[in-house]
Amino acid sequence: MSSILRLDRLRQFIGELATLLDSRPDESTLLAQAHPLLAELVHQDDWLPEDCARPDPQRYQQYLLHVDSRQRFSVVSFVWGPGQITPVHDHRVWGLIGMLRGAEYSQPYAFDAGGRPHPSGARRRLEPGEVEALSPRIGDVHQVSNAFSDRTSISIHVYGANIGAVRRAVFSAEGEEKPFISGYSNSRLPNIWDLSKENPA
């Protein structure tokens, strides 16, 4: 990684995604056109502030990087400690996941006739630079884990809302639905807008 933090990459992504949303595309078009934007962002690992890349030994961390002023989307760095794994959960909004560092596994789930979740389809391994889409329309129930037992992995998640305000659910093996709203691990946003440090007079 470069010693110079390229916050301009994150600013560019935010601006391009906001412009795309301004055109009010349908979901299929949105996911198709936002995919390469996120792929470009995670192709370079020189822009994420260190404060938003710190793992916790007890639990995976979700650092808010940006929320659109109209809450049309949010950008989160998802930091995995070694061997950490989520419960089976849904999202209720569209999302894109881009792998920045390390790798993660995503196992899709479906529900049987009795309402119990079960693995559905192949588990996918997401490598740096790769992007995966999800939504209630194409499938948004999955379980995700760090692919490594001995190191940190980081993925960048983009959601079609302020995910810190969306009521969604985790599911037990018996299909019991437990509502939750995922919070953020940071209390302050990274300052990506002070260009004076990047362009000194």
From Swiss-Prot:
Catalytic activity: 3-sulfanylpropanoate + O2 = 3-sulfinopropanoate + H(+)
Cofactors named for this entry: Fe(2+)
Superkingdom assignment: Bacteria
Listed SUPFAM superfamilies: RmlC-like cupins
Xref: InterPro entries: CDO_1, RmlC-like_jellyroll, RmlC_Cupin_sf
EC number from the UniProt entry: 1.13.11.91
Disulphide-bridged cysteine pairs: none
Protein's UniProt keywords contain Iron: yes
Class of enzymatic activity (EC top level): oxidoreductase
UniProt keyword terms in alphabetical order: Dioxygenase, Iron, Metal-binding, Oxidoreductase
Residues annotated to bind Fe cation: H89, H91, H142
Record-linked Pfam families: CDO_I
Amino-acid biosynthesis in keyword set: no
Subunit structure: Forms homodimer in the crystal; however, there is no evidence that the dimer exists under physiological conditions or has biological significance.
Annotated function: Thiol dioxygenase that catalyzes the dioxygenation of 3-mercaptopropionate (3-MPA) to 3-sulfinopropionate (3-SPA). To a lesser extent (40-fold lower efficiency), is also able to oxidize cysteine to cysteine sulfinate (CSA). Cannot use N-acetyl-L-cysteine, homocysteine, and cysteamine as substrates. The physiological role of this enzyme is unclear.
Additional information: Does not contain a cysteine-tyrosine cross-link observed in all mammalian cysteine dioxygenase (CDO) structures.
Name of this protein: 3-mercaptopropionate dioxygenase
UniProt organism field: Pseudomonas aeruginosa (strain ATCC 15692 / DSM 22644 / CIP 104116 / JCM 14847 / LMG 12228 / 1C / PRS 101 / PAO1)
